[in-house]
Amino acid sequence: MQIPKLKVLVEAGVVRQVEAIPEADGWAVWIVHATRSGERREVLERQRGGVRVFATLDAVARAVAGAGLSAFQVHVAGLAGAEAEPP
């Protein structure tokens, strides 16, 4: 899904969840939205196809806010050091 489609889904009020998930070079954004037959989970894509990877969570926040959303979840599993025990 690309940003224009996300904006349409936001305006329709069918977006249920937005998740930022670590990728090799940054963060991918997954969108869960309602459909006629239930729910669907789609990744945010670049204009020319392929997964859109954001370098920072700030960049994710700007894109999410620009689409009309006010919140998203961050998953840290898979980050370097995320599974390390606290000192």
PLM regions and their residue ranges:
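Short Gly/charged-rich anion-binding patches and loops
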Residues: 4-5, 59
